Regions:
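N-terminal hydrophobic membrane-entry segments
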Residues: 1-194
């Protein structure tokens, strides 16, 4: 009878040990998804996880999540912030910039370092890149007349995309495309006679 009890006790202990190991693996192993990658830092250096997973020990490691989805950021330039064109006209412009972190370890690492968790929320990301996008719009608008912008929207978008993509490339982001939603001449009240 002792031998049977010993076997049952061994089976129970083995099952308990397996349950504890499975629980620890579930708790310590972090997986990335198609929408969210992460960068693990701490012991053994940096590890970028784009598809797959890694062990994360809470005391020794820190993780920074990086959103991999394409985010749409609307930039409005109107009123006293309207663009000034080559012919000194004021243009009110609404554009959408589509940006994301490319699935490249270097880009994910850079985005984690420069942007942190802001890549997960369009509003927080807008705070970081809005000025860069507005500068690109202003720079290209200053080289073209209002009529040229209207007639050559494709060229305007191409130049804005080039300048904006270079500007945000240092943050780990890549610009997919720019879309002009609306383009109008600003009301005459917005003109400064001086």
């Amino acid at each position: 009878m002792t031998k049977g009890a010993d076997i049952i006790a061994a089976i129970i202990l083995l099952a308990l040990a397996i349950a504890i190991i499975v629980y620890l693996l579930h708790w310590l192993y972090r997986r990335s998804s198609k929408e969210v990658s992460f960068v693990r830092t701490g012991m053994l250096g940096e590890k970028v996880v784009i598809s797959g997973g890694a062990f994360v020990l809470p005391i020794i490691h820190n993780i920074t999540q990086v959103g991999m989805r394409t985010l749409s950021l609307t930039i409005k330039r109107g009123g006293d912030k309207s663009l000034i064109t080559k012919d000194r006209m004021r243009a009110e412009l609404v554009t959408e910039f589509f940006t994301k972190v490319p699935p490249d370890p270097r880009a994910v690492s850079t985005a984690a370092q420069t942007l942190g968790n802001r890549t997960l929320d369009p509003e927080h990301l807008r705070e970081v890149v809005q000025g860069r996008f507005a500068d690109a719009l202003g720079e290209v608008a200053a080289k073209m007349t209002l009529d040229e912008i209207q007639e050559n929207r494709g060229q305007f978008v191409k130049e804005v995309t080039k300048i904006a993509d270079e500007s945000i490339g240092h943050t780990g982001l890549a610009l997919e495309t720019v879309s002009i939603i609306s383009l109008d001449q600003a009301p005459i009240e917005q003109f400064n006679p001086a």
